[in-house]
Amino acid sequence: MNNEKNFLSYMVFILVCLVVMICYSSGIITNISEKIEESSTLAVNANYKSNNLIDDMEKNSEKIIETIKSFNGEKAVSYYITNEIDDKVVYLTFDDGPSVNTRKILDILKKYDIKATFFVVGKEDDESIELYKEIINNGHTIGNHSYSHDYKYIYTSLENYSEDFLRLQRLLKEKCNYDIEIARFPGGSNNTVSDRYHKDIMVDLSKYLIESNVTYFDWNVDSTDANATTMSVDNIIREAIKGAKQFNSPIILMHDAPPKTTTVYALPCVIETLKKDGYEFRALSPDEYVIQFLRAKY
């Protein structure tokens, strides 16, 4: 009798254990099912969002007639292109001069028998006037980079910008008998610093230059020499060459302000490497290849 009771107790214990295990397993299965369903939902949502993003990009791209993209790290930038060319041509551009570095750059350009573009600021000392003249006499192009290069002043109003812009135009005309036909906005036409002083002013300033028959230029290659007061020579060489080789016609942003000594040291290597790669060098012209981040619409 005792054996029967013991057997029944044992069987009850086994049944209880089985029930507990089944319930526990059901919970796990349910949880796994929920996780799978959740993952599937996330995947569907991600695919939906991705498709919507592609649709949005396609819709947006229709608003830009001709664009190219440059990838600098994780940043993608769109450009408007005018007069695209098939030749392999490099356009070296130097902003913020003249300075002691400008003459050194002019000597290098003369050595390699190539032309470039200098987006200058306003300086009226004798040495700077001579440098303006030397740029012109050596067959390079001068562009207007604003007289003051004072973001707060020129980007506060159209009146301030135009006054500053025309001051430099007059200086070059009076001292060098030179008519400036091209320009580059400090920070580029898509700069966001200007919004601190006047929201969306770049549209008005772009229209102003167009109405003044002045072509403004941006760039599609950044040498990164402005990313530090004095960037390393190796970094300038690497970024300039790497960026240039992405394009048939790279417009390279460089600087010849007083601290940019390493730009001078990097320049020969950049020139020699791109020459070996089959590029020729030209100065910018309003009638030739133009790249703009922002294009004003009427």
Regions from the language model: what does each represent?
Residues 53-56, 79-84, 112-124, 183-193, ...:
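Short charge-dense sequence patches
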Residues 17-28:
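Hydrophobic alpha-helical membrane-insertion segments, chiefly the h-region
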Residues 27-87:
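N-terminal, intrinsically disordered, polar/charged segments of Gram-positive cell-envelope systems
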Residues 149-253, 257-275, 279-280, 286-287, ...:
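Catalytic domains of cell-wall/extracellular-matrix polysaccharide-remodeling enzymes
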Residues 1-15:
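N-terminal Sec-pathway targeting helices
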Residues 60-160, 167-179, 273, 289:
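Active-site beta->alpha N-cap acidic-glycine motif
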